[in-house]
């Protein structure tokens, strides 16, 4: 049993290392981002990614990457995370419309329509309080920042605000807009 566990750990480590080598480290872009927004760049090691941590609205927002092994391949994602004081217990997920979300809708998956046609047609919004989501997403600046992301999965669950997108994001203006998005969301959620 112990040798099998060691083998699994070694295989996961190899997958992570290969993924980092294939996708490249975002260090140069992330150092620039940290400098531009007054954040801290923390260099990664062999088995952990580099990260950027910024204080946004008195919360620590962390940018990093993670890799999910599956079968003989793996997928790498860029993510941002922050704790949030979620007094109302609101939970939601916002993602771009795609084939799977359209199939889900056809099979009865709920999509919260906020009443703004271009946003409603481009995004799948799910959550536990439709009125709160409509109020939150009525904010033009918030919608603009969400719409500026070509790939997005933004969620609030419990006390964590979370963004993820496939691949390693090295585009500094896009990363800045993600930190701005978190700032606007933290303002609205903790008001």
What are these regions (language model features)?
Residues 1-33:
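N-terminal signal-anchor transmembrane alpha helix of single-pass membrane proteins
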Residues 29-59, 67-191:
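Charged, low-complexity intrinsically disordered regions
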């Amino acid at each position: 049993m112990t040798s099998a566990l060691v083998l699994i750990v070694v295989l996961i480590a190899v997958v992570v290392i290969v993924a980092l080598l294939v996708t490249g480290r975002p260090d140069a872009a992330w150092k620039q981002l940290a400098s531009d927004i007054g954040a801290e760049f923390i260099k990664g090691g062999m088995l952990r990614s580099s990260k950027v941590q910024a204080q946004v609205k008195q919360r620590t927002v962390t940018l990093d990457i993670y890799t999910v092994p599956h079968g003989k391949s793996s997928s790498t994602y860029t993510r941002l995370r922050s704790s949030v004081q979620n007094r109302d217990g609101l939970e939601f997920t916002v993602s771009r419309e795609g084939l799977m979300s359209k199939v889900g809708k056809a099979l009865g998956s709920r999509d919260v329509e906020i009443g703004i046609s271009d946003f409603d047609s481009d995004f799948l919004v799910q959550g536990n309080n439709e009125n709160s989501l409509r109020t939150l997403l009525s904010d033009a600046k918030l919608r603009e920042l969400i719409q500026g992301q070509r790939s997005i999965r933004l969620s609030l669950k419990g006390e964590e605000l979370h963004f993820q997108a496939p691949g390693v994001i090295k585009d500094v203006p896009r990363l800045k807009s993600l930190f701005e998005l978190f700032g606007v969301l933290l303002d609205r959620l903790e008001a």
